[in-house]
Amino acid sequence: MIKGLIYLFLFRCLEGRLADYEEESSDLGDYSLNGQTDEEYGKFPSHVLTEKETGPMDEIRCTNDDYTYNIKLNVHLQNYAIQAIADAAKPKLGMNLKERDAILSYFGTIANELNADLARLGAQIVIGLKHYKAEDFIDTNSFDTSCEIRDPVMDRLDSTFKQLKDVYQDSMGLRLFVWTCPQLTSSFETMKIMSNLNCGRIMGVLWQGADATRTSIKSTILEAISGVSELYLDGALPVDRVFSNVCRFCSKCVGVEPGVIGWKHPDVVKLIHAIPEEDTHEHGYDH
């Protein structure tokens, strides 16, 4: 509750300085082959705030230099998951949030928790919400919506990987997809990761409800950058167990020049994804 109030206070204080939300494109084909336009590299989305770290550096930090590895993660959800998150926002948060704000609240909270753990390593996650609607970003017509013919996570991720490979080639970046099914069975895979050249990772997670999926998402993100599976499944991150792998990913994949995977921020900072407040007026963007 206290953390939520702090994020809300920061959001209100800095609201005047935040840029407009990114405009959304409705078609994967309209996006550049590099996955992002050049001017987007190395820039924080408007919902991400920086907090300078002034304490002593941890001995397991990935670098002794005064910079932070920022890792960009783009998220994409099927419509049912979007609606479920938006519907759950009122009883869980006590607020009526617009669709995009509800998604930001859900993933922003996840990112803030991840970043609190990764701060020891000098690494931080940046959530990107462009194209957060999966159906507007990729072709889902071939998906088995019944989830009775093929394993949904494996089948959809395979199809998605091929589509992204055709468009982005070897510059996919890090992308997390949340898939949905009308019902769940114990035989389904709940998460899967596919790797591409240039450190690309395409992740798929099956929606299992807000709380269970939250744990799966955190575990999948950490596996994508560490190679260690089933992290966070007991509610905590064993940083000492994975720090060398995460640091290896950062040093190999996050360069001095901003790129599709992320960039080095020239300061020691912790990133905070500002959690939206209930809003009764128009933000000036379309959902």
Curated annotation (Swiss-Prot):
**Where does it reside?**
Cytoplasm; Spore wall; Spore polar tube
Q: How does it assemble?
A: Interacts with SWP9.
Gene assigned in the entry: SWP7
- Family the entry assigns: Belongs to the SWP7 family.
Q: Does the keyword Cell inner membrane apply?
A: no
| Cellular component, GO, one term | spore wall
A GO BP annotation: cell adhesion
Mind telling me what this protein is named? Spore wall protein 7
Task: State the organism named in the record.
Answer: Nosema bombycis (strain CQ1 / CVCC 102059)
The free-text function statement in the UniProt record for this protein reads: Involved in adherence of spores to the host cell surface and in infection efficiency.
What is the residue range of the signal peptide feature?
1-19
> Which terms are listed as keywords in the entry?
Cell adhesion, Cytoplasm, Signal
